[in-house]
């Protein structure tokens, strides 16, 4: 089977809305390329570019979505975007992201692609947890600012023996990190079946049992999420999805939340939403190139 690969350079400020749009029209897959270096950007470093690069994949029989994408970008980015496209085979589609995915350290973790497991493991510093990840077509390489923000904060939390739920798990990287830090049991859920398969694969690659880390299809209204009590809820999900699910979030039995996926322009609106609907207060905040991490505690 062939796929249409569209390579896009678009303004960073429309990236969140663009990913929401791609989800709505139902493309075969996409990912955002941010950087591919070993050492994360230091806080004092300047942002290299105001643009971000996407690779979007369309199934061979999909004759409409490329036009929809270009119309969307014309309307929202004007002339400030670049695109090119080509036909690729299934193997290229599944392997394309490997070109941009290298081992790197964030906080207490070193994210290692599964195909570099044997060579990179021996060079992992002592005291750093290795996370073996093959993102496939699921979100969560660890390169995205939102994922790095959560990983960085998780390394400063005491997770041993804690009961954790990860909503919108993507590749499962955050759940794997929680397990490596001693959390158990963990429930990772995602509405995308590809993500469920990817997260399950990565769990197994890290020799984590299904008793410690269960991966299931679902969202905030998942029966197990709503029916149990949790020490920590992790949600690396866009503001639009968080806002749409706020009442489901309110009903989850936990007093401790880690949210990411919120852009700086929406931060105040999101904090007001949490204050009015969830209650409690923010206890830790961090920003990375226009993306926000919010650690929130509800008063028990």
From Swiss-Prot:
Organism annotation: Leptospira borgpetersenii serovar Hardjo-bovis (strain JB197)
Purpose of the protein: Methylates ribosomal protein L11.
Residues in the signal sequence: none
InterPro entries in the cross-refs: Ribosomal_L11_MeTrfase_PrmA, Ribosomal_PrmA_MeTrfase, SAM-dependent_MTases_sf
Swiss-Prot/TrEMBL catalytic activity: L-lysyl-[protein] + 3 S-adenosyl-L-methionine = N(6),N(6),N(6)-trimethyl-L-lysyl-[protein] + 3 S-adenosyl-L-homocysteine + 3 H(+)
Annotated protein name in UniProt: Ribosomal protein L11 methyltransferase
Gene: prmA
GO BP term, example: methylation
Keywords: Cytoplasm, Methyltransferase, S-adenosyl-L-methionine, Transferase
Domain of life per record: Bacteria
Main location: cytoplasm
Entry-linked Gene3D superfamilies: Vaccinia Virus protein VP39
């Amino acid at each position: 089977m062939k796929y249409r690969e569209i390579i896009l350079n678009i303004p960073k400020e429309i990236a969140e809305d663009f990913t929401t749009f791609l989800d709505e029209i139902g493309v075969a897959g996409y990912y955002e390329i941010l950087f591919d270096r070993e050492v994360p950007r230091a806080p004092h470093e300047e942002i290299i570019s105001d643009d971000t690069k996407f690779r979007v994949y369309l199934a061979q029989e999909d004759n409409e979505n490329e036009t929809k994408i270009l119309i969307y970008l014309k309307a929202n980015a004007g002339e400030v975007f670049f695109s090119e496209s080509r036909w690729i085979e299934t193997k290229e589609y599944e392997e394309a992201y490997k070109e941009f995915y290298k081992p790197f350290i964030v906080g207490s973790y070193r994210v290692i692609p599964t195909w570099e497991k044997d060579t990179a493991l021996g060079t992992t510093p002592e005291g750093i947890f290795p996370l073996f990840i093959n993102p496939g077509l699921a979100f969560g390489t660890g390169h995205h600012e939102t994922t790095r923000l959560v990983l960085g904060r998780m390394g400063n939390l005491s997770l041993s023996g804690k009961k954790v739920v990860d909503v919108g798990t993507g590749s499962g990287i955050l759940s794997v990190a929680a397990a490596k830090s001693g959390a158990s049991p963990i429930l990772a859920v995602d509405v995308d079946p590809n993500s469920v398969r990817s997260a399950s694969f990565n769990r197994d690659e890290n020799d984590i049992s299904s008793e410690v880390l269960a991966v299931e299809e679902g969202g905030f209204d998942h029966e197990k999420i709503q029916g149990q009590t949790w020490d920590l809820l992790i949600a690396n999900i866009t503001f639009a999805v968080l806002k749409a699910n706020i009442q489901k979030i309110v009903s989850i039995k936990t007093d401790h939340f880690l949210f990411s996926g919120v852009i700086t322009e929406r931060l105040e609106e999101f904090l007001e939403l949490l204050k009015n609907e969830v209650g409690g207060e923010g206890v830790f905040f961090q920003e990375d190139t226009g993306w926000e991490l919010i650690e929130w505690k509800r008063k028990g």
